[in-house]
Amino acid sequence: VLRTLLVTNDFPPRPGGIQNYLNSLATRLPADDLVVYAPSWERSSGSHVEFDAAAPFEVVRHPTSLMLPTPDVLRRAKQIMRARDCEAVWFGAAAPLALLGHPLRQAGARRIVASTHGHEVGWSMLPGSRQALRRIGETVDVVTYVSKYTRNRFAAAFGRHAGLEMLPSGVDTTVFAPDPAGREEIRARHGLGDRPTVVCVSRLVPRKGQDMLISALPAIRERVPGAALLLVGGGPYRKRLTQLAEVLDVADDVVFTGSVPWEELPAHYNAGDVFAMPARTRGKGLDVEGLGIVYLEASATGLPVVAGTSGGAPEAVLDEVTGHVVDGRDPGQLAETLAALLSDPVRARRMGEAGRSWVAENWRWDTMARRLSTLLDGDPVAAVR
């Protein structure tokens, strides 16, 4: 692999899906061939100082918590690139930092890769930011995408010169795996006993559909006595969701765990009998699910999965094989689907086993990291413009 500088706003210990995506790939590249340039992160829950000390690769922190394509960020990126003899640049999120691609190529970058995730779909719908995507597409060698949906939505915005390559999220199937002991521990912690349980692991925001899970719960409980809902994650929507559960008289049947440590996530998946995140597109198409790594993590854990139709979410499920794809705006359909799975453990287990096999064969991080290495090592194809 060409010695690579990863320039990104999104990196641990700051939490989030993009952060986990980039770190999961970064830790699988040769550590001596990677330098990361990312913002500072100081919170009561953790500091970048501890994270960087334990990282296998070098991390250089920007003095503030936000990086934009400014002259200061460009100057620092050039300094790092030259001091560490980096020949490739990888932008963790194309928009907006990959606008620095052209000057970094002039500074000596032989190969430039820019990753996308989902928010670029929104950028592609707004005239000003669409122009920024076009500039990026004309100056980088490769734009990676996480799902066919996102590619179809923003390919035209990046322009005909953009080299588009798929690089979706992966799953560590040794971490996300069936774990009966972890299941019992989490169930005991939250008083779930042997109740049939739907689990959702996600930030509490409207797009993810936790409100629809709560709305569907009364109908589910009519068919599946004792059914409960385990909502794993924190976020601004919690108060609204708590109120909804109280109004629908299911407050005692909905468990809010709040944010949980990353190392406890596999056990929380295991605590469920079915995984569901009925994601729906919002904001006139601007707020959309890029892929939905949680569906794949749930499948790797051996759970049947129920996904919404938003964006690339259906690509993370084999409909009727590893789970079901439903309309995230229809609590009736959602209730019917979940009740059927909860009341048929044999079918649910069969879907979960199929999901684990599918993820192990097609979605492993090691496979994705090898693909990224190939993209970073390729011959330069974009002329300096």
Positions of the model-derived regions?
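Nucleotide-activated donor-binding/catalytic signature segment of Leloir-type glycosyltransferases, i.e.
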Residues: K239-E264, V274
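Acidic donor-binding loop of glycosyltransferase active sites
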Residues: S259, N270-V288, L303
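Conserved acidic donor-binding segment of nucleotide-sugar-dependent glycosyltransferases
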Residues: A316-E320, H324-G332, A340-V346
